[in-house]
């Protein structure tokens, strides 16, 4: 299994990466979204550029999976969770970044911090992602990426991928 081999080599749980692939493309390698995301893992061209991968190579399943793993690693290292953060909170916040971009999630985390709440709690971050559609939140000095109207889709994405990951964990060993 290509997803398993690449994910294990890159230090990620192949079952999570498979859950992402299922949600993103239903394992269809030659799909392109309306927004320009490509392949099994629905990678944006800007991500390919970050990792010096030519746009023409993005549809290659192995390259696409490798890019998704690299993106997950970059998100994880950028977020710098403290030691006490639960695995579920960590995974949910990382998946939200994968789906909506790290900027909106970081805005939600900054809003949580400014309001005295836990920026490492998915429940809190999810609430602030939703609130970023309202001017009193997206006009805050803590917000760098402006208004966010995609929270419903992002929250559904996180729930769906984690639900599928949980199923994969029940039926397949790591």
Spans of features found by a protein language model:
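Short glycine-/small-residue-rich flexible loop motifs, especially phosphate/cofactor-binding loops
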Residues: 4, 18, 45
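A short, acidic/glycine-rich surface segment
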Residues: 28-31, 82
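N-terminal export signals and maturation junctions of secreted/periplasmic proteins
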Residues: 1-8, 29-30
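Soluble periplasmic/extracytoplasmic beta-strand elements of cell-envelope proteins
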Residues: 19, 42, 94-97
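Short, surface-exposed glycine/acidic/tryptophan-bearing loops
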Residues: 31-50, 114, 122
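Extracytoplasmic
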Residues: 12-17, 22, 35-38, 90, ...
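Non-catalytic cell-wall polysaccharide-engagement segments
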Residues: 2, 10, 49-63, 67-70, ...
